[in-house]
Each structure stands twice: as C-alpha cells, then as structure tokens.
Amino acid sequence: MSRPDYAVRLLRLAEEDLNEIVSYVAADRPSAAEELADRIEKNLQLLSRIPGLGRVPAEQQLVRLGYRYLVIENYLVFYTLEGATI
C-alpha cells in the first residue's frame, strides 16, 4: 500500500517571488518563462512524492531548522517538512 503524496504549500512570500521571477523572465523571453514555471511546478510535484529529494544546506542554522532545498536552473527552492506538508 503506497503512502499518499505530501501536500505542498507555498508561503505567500514564495508565491510572490515566483511570480516576480516568471514576470522578469517573460519580459524578454515569454516561452522561457513558461518553461521555467512548468519546470518549477514539475519539481514541486516530484517533491510531494519524494520529500527527501532536496539537498541538505551547508548552513548549520538551516539544517537545525530542518530546511532542505532544490536547485531549479539558477534558483534555489528552500522547504521544510512539517507532518504531511511541505
């Protein structure tokens, strides 16, 4: 029996950052912005199935707080796991 996927919840600040990044890229290259948004979405979906996928940061304070991160192109996506929510 498989475990259900974890829920992925973006903080409001993360949503704002994501929108700003996609808008910035779209100003010069709309198709690249769409590809970036799709790549981030696919990585978040993968993370919901495999929450240990991300790397452990080198900064010990972040490690103590339970942070991990994904590298998506030139961007870092930091996350924590709280119960069944990322």
Annotated model-derived regions:
Residues 1-67:
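Basic, Lys/Arg-enriched alpha-helical interface segments
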Residues 54-86:
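Basic/aromatic recognition patch in beta-strand/loop cores that engages polyanionic ligands
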